Amino acid sequence: MQKQNSKMYPVVHFEMPAEDRVRVADFYTRVFGWETNQLGADMGNYLLVMTTESDKKGPKKPGAINGGFYQKTPDAPSCPSVVIKVDNLAQHIEKVKKAGGKILGEPMDIPNVGLFVSFADTEGNRVGLMQPYGQ
């Protein structure tokens, strides 16, 4: 087992692409009972998904995560990805680069949530980093 950091950072969110967010919302609501919240154009028409009972801090059940769907486009990743919670986004951007990853775009502010950026790991997987507000 490989372990370098004294602190482990948890997966707190998942993302999947969707061609039709209305259709995908209906599918996951009908099959799994998930609740959805369609955000506006200012948030990229992102579709938030609650997979378990949640409040403003997130899922109430320990270990559970919520997620979302983004518009599937030719230049966006076409596979699911995860978001990892960190306590210092700038520091982790540097760690990603130093370890051989590539930052995808610029960090963005998600109102009332936190700072977010995506990266590609050494295998080409798209992963998100989130520094929640209040950290």
Region spans (language model):
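Short hydrophobic/aromatic beta-strand element in the GNAT-like acyltransferase core
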Residues: Y46, N66, F116-S118
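Core segments of cupin and vicinal oxygen chelate
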Residues: M8, E15-G63, K98
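N-terminal beta-strand motif that seeds the catalytic metal site of vicinal oxygen chelate
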Residues: M1-D26, C79-V82, V86, P132-Q135
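Vicinal oxygen chelate
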Residues: Q2-K7, M16, N37-G40, I93-Q135
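A structural feature recognizing the 12-helix transmembrane core of secondary solute carriers
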Residues: V24-A25, T29, P77, I93, ...
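Mid-chain, well-packed structural core segment of small domains
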Residues: P74-A99
